[in-house]
Regions:
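N-terminal beta-loop-helix "entrance" segment that forms/cooperates
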Residues: 38-58
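N-terminal glycine-rich anion-binding loop in soluble enzyme alpha/beta folds
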Residues: 4-42
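Active-site histidine-anchored catalytic micro-motif
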Residues: 4-6, 30-35, 47-50, 61-71, ...
Length: 218
């Protein structure tokens, strides 16, 4: 593998502590040539669905890169760390459903590997900070041209954890849809697409009324 000039980071670490900087520092020590692009560090803590939606919406617009994503409430458990090859990128992070939608947005998973090779992680691995100790080093080594299969054994992509399908039901002339994300500007993304809109006679750009327990808004 030729390596990468870019590494992106998407986490729930926030900016009030040094977690983000620690990941930057580990990457810089191993792959000083790589530029790091911060997608966001403001994912709702532990909200894997939120992180997966933001990542999937963003990575198609980024240059060829190693994309590191860490929203990892299962850190320190038996959950796997993985690297997924997809499109012109490699996605690195926990096997908890976070990475799969992003891989699908890049055209699907070509291959998947479990991150178990100690040579490509820090010598001391914290039970609670795999972003710094496992995922950032793996990404940096990939950026330097290390082949993904050096990081650990190939795994069946169908064995990867996936998130439950968001609720979306067409009920007569109504749609009941789960809220997937609410962005910084208050825009609400629902688990409803063009097919569901067409089923009740609507189209992109149509005016609708939203009802929830606090009231309704057009």
């Amino acid at each position: 593998m030729a390596g990468f000039d870019w590494i992106s980071l998407c986490t729930d670490y926030g900016c009030a502590d040094g977690f983000m900087a620690a990941c930057h520092g580990v990457i810089a020590r191993i792959a000083s040539h790589a530029r790091v692009l911060d997608v966001t560090h403001a994912i709702t803590p532990g909200d894997v669905r939120h992180g997966s939606a933001v990542l999937a919406d963003t990575v198609p617009w980024l240059p060829p890169a190693v994309h590191v994503a860490v929203v990892d409430p299962g850190v320190g458990t038996a959950r796997r760390g993985v690297a997924l090859l997809s499109g012109d990128a490699v996605l690195v992070g926990p096997d908890n459903g976070l990475l799969v939608p992003a891989a699908q947005s890049l055209g699907g998973i070509r291959a998947a590997y479990e991150l178990v090779e100690p040579s490509y992680r820090l010598s001391a691995v914290s039970a609670t900070f795999h972003g710094r100790d496992v995922f950032a080093p793996a990404a940096a080594h990939l950026a330097c041209g290390v082949s993904p299969d050096a990081l650990g054994p190939a795994i069946d992509p169908t064995s990867l954890v996936t998130l439950p399908t968001p609720v979306c039901q067409v009920d007569g002339n109504r749609i009941r849809a789960e809220v997937v994300t609410v962005d910084h500007f208050g825009n609400v993304a629902l688990a409803a697409g063009a097919a569901e809109l067409a089923a009740i006679g609507l189209w992109a750009g149509a005016s609708v009324t939203l009802r929830w327990p606090a009231g309704e808004q057009r």
